[in-house]
Amino acid sequence: MIIWIASYPKSGNTWIRSLLSSYLFSSNGEFSFNLLENIKQFSSRDFSSELKNKELDNQNQIFSNWLPSQRLINKDKKIHILKTHNAMCNINGNNFTDEFNTSAVIYIVRDPRNLITSLAHHYELNLDEAFKFLTNERKIIFPLDENTRNENNKLKDLNFISSWSSHYISWKNIKFCPIKGMMCIF
């Protein structure tokens, strides 16, 4: 089953992953960037043999593979800790996750007044642009380390994040693991 470390971008997900990785995966509790590989970022593309080398024409191909990818991850019946920036959403009938794939959620909340400055620096935006980013109900982000599309204009990956408030509410109102969920607020 999956334990999600979920957050809006620039909220401290990597920091929490660093703490957990040092605690769970090192013999002496010391941090190393190599340890972050133990808590990967969820991408349906990375975990789906069907999607791994396939060229994607539209976003719905990614959304429709969220649950099948999670079922593949959970085939080994082990606990998997995964990072996500996706909102807990349903797009075109495709749920991001469900009670059959999720054991618990660690949701990280960062005050949006602090987050906006971090967003502006990270994405090289002015504060007005960062505010629009933060309040965009249909916001999608793409990996920064790669181009959004490959040389054939096919999608590589994406995260549907929505606005900061909708993202927070989507995970706060999760119904199938409310007791096991944990919220980090800073």
Predicted regions and their residues:
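PAPS-dependent sulfotransferase catalytic domain
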Residues: M1-M183
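G-domain G4 guanine-recognition motif of GTPases
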Residues: F186
